[in-house]
């Protein structure tokens, strides 16, 4: 450091000490004036004395605190001027730091990013309404298998006959082993005969069911009343008369020719 700088610092600190002394003298004079104001005509009270003693103690504590802070500031300025590193106490740093309102609060949640958000309540409701197997409340549509008399590749009779042919061919290809006996052959023949009889019975039952359906239709026709039959005949005659346009035109031409003659 230069001599000029050292001189300025010493002079600055001397001025600060002089200012402190003057402030202390001014405070003492003010306290004396207060005492004179309260002690008029030589009257004094013990309570006032106690209050004054407490005020003096508090004022002395405040003065000591102010001096302590002032010395700390002066030491800090000295360390900064000398360029030396000095540890700063935590209390001074805490006093100089700003309030927490400027800083981020840890209690606040982090900002939300633009992501897909599923409506979980709606999903749970849909899962509750759904069932493992969807039930159909509508009535079943009647399905009648159409059996054509012609034996095509898709007809039922053709497929049954084809299946029987293949089964017979497989039975013939099976070779007889040494362990097979005559009794086994007889049992196989009996089983084949039983199968044939069952198939014949099924065919007869099927034919009977078809004939029964036709009989039912005939019975329904017979149950119709005579009034319905008469109404039907009238309707048929009116429909024929309405759609037989050729006859109507011919009759009109005949009438015109008669009028001209």
Curated annotation (Swiss-Prot):
Residues 1-150 are annotated as: Required for binding to pppB. Residues 1-261 are annotated as: Disordered. InterPro entries: PPI-2 (IPR007062). Residues 1-16, 154-163, 226-250 have a biased composition (Basic and acidic residues). Residues 123-134 have a biased composition (Polar residues). It comes from the Eukaryota. One of its GO terms (molecular function) is protein phosphatase inhibitor activity. Keywords: Coiled coil, Protein phosphatase inhibitor. Pfam families: IPP-2 (PF04979). Residues 150-242 form a coiled coil. One of its GO terms (biological process) is intracellular signal transduction. Residues 195-206 have a biased composition (Basic residues). Residues 17-60, 212-225 have a biased composition (Acidic residues). Belongs to the protein phosphatase inhibitor 2 family. Inhibitor of protein-phosphatase 1 (PP1). Interacts with pppB. This is Protein phosphatase inhibitor 2. It comes from Dictyostelium discoideum (Social amoeba).
């Amino acid at each position: 450091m230069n001599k000029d700088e050292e001189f300025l610092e010493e002079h600055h600190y001397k001025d600060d000490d002089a200012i402190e002394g003057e402030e202390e003298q001014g405070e003492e004079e003010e306290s004396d004036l207060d005492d004179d104001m309260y002690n008029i005509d030589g009257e004094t009270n013990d309570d006032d004395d106690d209050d004054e003693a407490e005020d003096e103690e508090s004022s002395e504590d405040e003065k000591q605190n102010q001096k302590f802070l002032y010395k700390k500031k002066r030491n800090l300025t000295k360390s900064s001027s000398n360029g030396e590193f000095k540890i700063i106490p935590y209390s001074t740093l805490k006093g100089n730091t700003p309030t927490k309102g400027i800083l981020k609060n840890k209690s606040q949640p982090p900002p939300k990013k633009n992501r897909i958000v599923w409506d979980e309540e709606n999903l749970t409701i849909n899962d509750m309404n759904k069932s493992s197997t969807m039930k159909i409340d509508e009535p079943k549509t009647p399905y009648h298998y159409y059996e054509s008399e012609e034996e095509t590749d898709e007809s039922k009779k053709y497929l049954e006959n084809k299946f029987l042919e293949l089964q017979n061919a497989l039975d013939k290809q099976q070779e007889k082993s040494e362990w097979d006996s005559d009794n086994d052959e007889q049992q196989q023949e009996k089983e084949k005969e039983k199968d044939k009889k069952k198939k014949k019975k099924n065919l007869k039952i099927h034919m009977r069911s078809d004939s029964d359906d036709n009989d039912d239709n005939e019975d329904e026709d017979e149950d119709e009343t005579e009034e319905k039959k008469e109404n039907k005949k009238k309707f048929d005659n009116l429909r024929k008369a309405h759609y037989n346009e050729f006859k109507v035109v011919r009759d009109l031409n005949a009438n015109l020719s008669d009028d001209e003659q």
